[in-house]
A protein has these predicted regions:
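Catalytic-core regions of core metabolic enzymes
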Residues: 1-294
């Protein structure tokens, strides 16, 4: 079984009747994702792309079993939606929503931890197991099945880099966005711990960006635990000026912390091959894996 989701994963879409929810429900279904129900309060009894809609997660689960949730609920109501998913035992809960207040995010993460629930995001493009299932907004055609895991703070860079790996004949085991907000569920270290034991993954690509300390923490983990699989990385935002937010709420340099230079240095010290430009990653990945060198 892949690390988070696989072809057997049964999914509920929270916020299925909204523009994004309904659009991406159709694309996820077309990719092969097993969406068993949608939830939008007040819209119970309707259907979206043939999928039954319920007023609550609890009523959706009374009608049939589900494993995981993907959340397209607007930021103001996302906390409530996440709590409902956690209460119902859905795991993982993949939160696509951007702009969730930090205080709400802290409450969600604390509650998830108490309940042993894995949260992906918020402000994530989601998670995909290529050729099997995708939960989120990733364009399926960028990905192909294989043995390289891609873990990213950026959505669009995930697609670009995965597409370049695919183009070079290097498939992926799992690709996921940890989310661009300052407070997220899974971080790089959590995912590396999963990938360490994952028989489907031979090597890892980390896509980081300025701000915060997620990449430095990953570098420390890789170094101190002698992470057994090769890791390549790219850090976005080398040219970013201090104090300016670059796209994501979490992508901001404060003082000397969180600069691209620091992150690149820490990763390099940990034995990670850091790409100068995203298009270098297929080559670096190929050089690290004997089976790909032919």
């Amino acid at each position: 079984v892949p690390i988070l989701v696989g072809r057997q994963t049964r999914v509920i879409v929270q916020g299925i009747t909204g523009n994004q929810g309904s659009f991406h429900t159709r694309l996820m279904s077309e990719y092969g994702t097993r969406i068993v129900a949608g939830v939008t309060p007040g819209k119970g009894g309707t259907r979206v792309s043939g999928i039954p809609v319920f007023d609550t997660v609890a009523s959706a689960l009374e009608a049939g079993d589900a494993d995981a949730s993907v959340v397209f609920v607007p930021a103001a109501f996302a906390k409530e939606a996440a709590m409902e998913a956690i209460d119902s035992g859905l795991n993982p809960v993949v939160m696509i929503t951007e702009g969730i207040p930090s205080r709400d995010a802290m409450v969600i993460m604390a509650y998830a931890k108490e309940n042993d629930t894995t949260i992906v995001g918020p402000n994530t493009p989601g998670v995909i197991t290529p050729g099997e299932t995708k939960l989120g907004i990733m364009p399926g055609n960028a990905f192909s099945p294989g043995k390289v895991a891609v873990v990213s703070r950026s959505g669009t860079l995930t697609y670009e880099i995965s597409a370049s790996l695919t183009h070079e004949g290097i498939g992926q085991s799992t690709c996921l966005g940890i989310g661009g907000d300052p407070i997220t569920g899974l971080d790089f270290v959590d995912v590396l711990k999963m990938l360490r034991e994952d028989p489907h993954t031979d090597s890892v690509v980390l896509i980081g960006e300025i701000g915060g300390s997620a990449e430095e923490d990953a570098a420390r983990y890789i170094r101190e635990t002698r992470f057994p699989k090769p890791v390549a990385a790219y850090i976005a935002g080398r040219a970013a000026p201090p104090g300016k937010r670059m796209g994501h709420a979490g992508a901001i340099i404060t003082g000397s912390e969180g600069t691209a230079a620091t992150k690149i240095e820490r990763l390099t010290e940990a034995g990670v091959r850091v790409a100068e430009v995203p298009s270098d990653l297929p080559r670096l990945t190929r050089e690290q894996i004997p089976q790909l060198r032919q």
